[in-house]
From Swiss-Prot:
Molecular function GO labels: protein folding chaperone; vascular endothelial growth factor receptor 2 binding
Protein's UniProt name: Phosducin-like protein 3
Organism: Rattus norvegicus (Rat)
Residues annotated with N-acetylmethionine modification: 1
Transferase is among the record's keywords: no
Triggers of expression: By heat shock.
Highest classification ranks of the organism: Eukaryota, Metazoa, Chordata, Craniata, Vertebrata
Keyword Phosphoprotein appears in the UniProt entry: yes
Modified residue annotations for Phosphoserine: 44, 65, 235, 237
InterPro entries, per the entry: Phosducin-like_chap/apop_reg, Phosducin_thioredoxin-like_dom, Thioredoxin-like_sf
Keywords, ordered alphabetically: Acetylation, Angiogenesis, Apoptosis, Chaperone, Cytoplasm, Endoplasmic reticulum, Host-virus interaction, Phosphoprotein
Region ranges (Disordered): 21-42
Pfam families assigned to the protein according to its UniProt record, in alphabetical order: Phosducin (PF02114)
Cited function: Acts as a chaperone for the angiogenic VEGF receptor KDR/VEGFR2, increasing its abundance by inhibiting its ubiquitination and degradation. Inhibits the folding activity of the chaperonin-containing T-complex (CCT) which leads to inhibition of cytoskeletal actin folding. Acts as a chaperone during heat shock alongside HSP90 and HSP40/70 chaperone complexes. Modulates the activation of caspases during apoptosis.
């Protein structure tokens, strides 16, 4: 097929008759090609700086044009905001000890969207010590959740020891779940996975456990009851 932009006598006649559109000027073609090339370069730059860390952006900033600098600065601010949000979410990682006077600041005013797990305990109660140990592991595993503990009577005067251990789960100052007394926790057989599952049911943490670990233990026990180990028959010991 003949190129309608070709500079031929026949094409000139067709243009005069209005059969062919006016020929694109060389300048227009060059501008169009330059625009496409600039777009390709910009896309290349975007792909480059989107893969960079904040430190790498700073090291390579002299290599970008003025237009790129504006785009990169916007991207830098976005990355910085994301980094700050991550640091805010991951600012805990341990169980904090508080007293009653700290309650309002550490629980009620803990922060928007923040989950708080409070363990009321007393020294000398073995199950309280076990739960404190488990909570330390969970605090490291879920650093975006605020885990705190307090001696019970410093927060609630005359709080009965029979209610210990007690765990309250809060979100934005409101109680979302409460676990009161040793029976709720299953006694000293409580595992860290079982405690993680309990807290996940309240919404405080996002567990990767697929089912209640206590259920698995029950299934094993029930299976052993249904299918007892057969008694050994020592038939060879009795000879006529």
């Amino acid at each position: 097929m003949q190129d309608p932009n070709a500079d031929t006598e026949w094409n000139d006649i067709l243009r005069k008759k209005g059969i062919l559109p006016p020929k694109e000027s060389l300048k227009e073609l060059e501008e169009e090609e330059e625009g496409k090339e600039e777009q390709r370069l910009q896309q290349s730059v975007v792909k480059t700086y989107e893969d960079m860390t904040l430190e790498e952006l700073q090291e390579n900033e002299d290599e970008f044009s003025e237009e790129d600098e504006r785009a990169i600065e916007m991207y830098r601010q976005q990355r910085l905001a994301e980094w700050k949000a991550t640091q805010l979410r991951n600012k805990f990682g341990e169980v904090l000890e508080i007293s009653g006077k700290d309650y309002v600041q550490e629980v009620t005013k803990a922060g928007e969207g923040l989950w708080v797990v409070l363990h009321l305990y007393k020294q000398g109660i073995p199950l309280c010590s076990l739960i404190n140990h488990h909570l330390s592991g969970l605090a490291r595993k879920f650093p975006d959740v605020k885990f705190i503990k307090a001696i019970s009577t410093t927060c609630i005067p005359n709080y009965p020891d029979r209610n210990l251990p007690t765990v309250f789960v809060y979100r934005e100052g409101d109680i979302k779940a409460q676990f009161i007394g040793p029976l709720v926790f299953g006694g000293m057989n409580l595992t860290i996975d079982e405690l993680e599952w309990k807290l996940s049911e309240s919404g405080a943490i996002k567990t990767e456990l697929e089912e209640n670990p206590k259920k698995a233990i029950k299934d094993v026990l029930l299976s052993s009851v249904r299918d007892p180990v057969p008694m050994r028959r020592d038939s060879d010991s009795e000879d006529d």
